[in-house]
């Protein structure tokens, strides 16, 4: 009996791991459109958190900031410095809201996957997770970044923007065009892969061992999640700055 009990425990653990599914989705039919409800729900939760924090922090502004206002101003200063460093002193100001929105949405989304008990909410299909755990979200963010740096380049340089594709020699035209396609791909898959892998590792560890053991991994996940948000925002700002400068 003593020999059989550990074997049963191992089998149960393996069965729980096999239940960790990837790619199961819950859809809602809205008119003629099929909506990915999991991403929609968690994204709106993240947006509500950001709006709530903004309202609380700015409802009673003081000349000398204290408490939550001080924290918000520190975050905004960090985003402003990041944008200015990558885009440049003269052109950075209009892009602070865009880069800030990207950074804060990704940051809160990533942390929500580690801190929120999404999986206790039962759905007919699949399960809730961080918005950035889904490739649809990360691709959308990357495409927004692509639109932003195309707009920045065309707005600043006009049609001469397209001259970059034949610099320093027309032979590099295919490679330069391909580069514009690989930028959003690298942004989206890097963010998606890291967040998905982190959540899967934690889910497997919780299935195998007691709750206390995965805690260090969860803290590591929080750190890497913050780094991924910073990397995405930094690269987005760098691409925008590069498109306005006119060289690689």
UniProtKB/Swiss-Prot annotation:
Keyword entries, A-Z: ATP synthesis, CF(0), Chloroplast, Hydrogen ion transport, Ion transport, Membrane, Plastid, Thylakoid, Transmembrane, Transmembrane helix, Transport
Regions crossing the membrane? 37-57, 96-116, 135-155, 200-220, 221-241
GO MF entry, a single one: proton-transporting ATP synthase activity, rotational mechanism
Q: Cellular component GO terms, alphabetically?
A: chloroplast thylakoid membrane; plasma membrane; proton-transporting ATP synthase complex
Instruction: Give yes or no: UniProt keyword Thylakoid.
Output: yes
Where does the record say this protein resides? Plastid, Chloroplast thylakoid membrane
Annotated signal peptide: none
Q: Which residues form a coiled coil?
A: none
Q: How does it sit in the membrane?
A: Multi-pass membrane protein
Q: Which InterPro entries match?
A: ATP_syn_F0_a_bact/chloroplast (IPR045082), ATP_synth_F0_asu (IPR000568), ATP_synth_F0_asu_AS (IPR023011), F0_ATP_A_sf (IPR035908)
Q: What is its main location?
A: plastid
- State the NCBIfam families in the record: ATP_synt_6_or_A
**Complex and partners:** F-type ATPases have 2 components, CF(1) - the catalytic core - and CF(0) - the membrane proton channel. CF(1) has five subunits: alpha(3), beta(3), gamma(1), delta(1), epsilon(1). CF(0) has four main subunits: a, b, b' and c.
Q: Which family does it belong to?
A: Belongs to the ATPase A chain family.
Looking up HAMAP family in the UniProt record yields: ATP_synth_a_bact
Known function: Key component of the proton channel; it plays a direct role in the translocation of protons across the membrane.
Protein name (database record): ATP synthase subunit a, chloroplastic
The organism is Angiopteris evecta
Source gene?
A: atpI
């Amino acid at each position: 009996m003593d020999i059989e009990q550990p074997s049963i425990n191992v089998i149960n653990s393996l069965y729980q791991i096999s239940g960790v599914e990837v790619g199961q989705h819950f859809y809602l039919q809205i008119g003629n459109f099929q909506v990915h409800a999991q991403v929609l729900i968690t994204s709106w939760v993240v947006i509500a958190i950001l709006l709530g924090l903004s309202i609380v922090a700015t409802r009673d502004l003081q000349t000398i900031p204290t408490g939550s206002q001080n924290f918000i101003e520190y975050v905004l200063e960090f985003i402003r410095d990041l944008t200015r460093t990558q885009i440049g002193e003269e052109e950075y100001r209009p892009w602070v809201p865009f880069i800030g929105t990207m950074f804060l949405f990704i940051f809160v989304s990533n942390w929500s996957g580690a801190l929120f008990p999404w999986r206790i909410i039962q759905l007919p299909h699949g399960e809730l997770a961080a918005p950035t755990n889904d490739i649809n979200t990360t691709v959308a963010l990357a495409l927004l970044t692509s639109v932003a740096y195309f707009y920045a380049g065309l707005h600043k340089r006009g049609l001469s923007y397209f001259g970059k594709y034949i610099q320093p020699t027309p032979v590099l035209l295919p490679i330069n065009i391909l580069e514009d396609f690989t930028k959003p791909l690298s942004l989206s898959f890097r963010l998606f892969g890291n967040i998905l892998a982190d959540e899967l590792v934690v889910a497997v560890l919780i299935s195998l061992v007691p709750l206390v053991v995965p805690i260090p991994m969860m803290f590591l996940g929080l750190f890497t999640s913050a780094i991924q948000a910073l990397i995405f925002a930094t690269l987005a700002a760098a691409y925008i700055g590069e498109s306005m400068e006119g060289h690689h």
